[in-house]
Amino acid sequence: MDRLVYIVDKSGKLYVGITTDIDNRLRQHGNPPLLHKEGPMINVEAVNRERQIKGWNREKKQSLCEKMPEKQM
């Protein structure tokens, strides 16, 4: 099943995760702002990308979020 890697702003912190259903996952998080999403990709790719992004500092994550076109939101 295809996965999405996403970043949300949850209580002032950038949360990075993986999901197959972004709408449901956002509801589970309490509907925080979706800042970035990538995919679809296979599970291995998504896990690797999530791990990569989680290793970044906040500034680099924010820079990635700023590059996402509005139409993808």
Task: Mark where each language-model region is.
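GIY-YIG nuclease catalytic motif and its immediate N-terminal context
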Residues: 1-51, 58-73
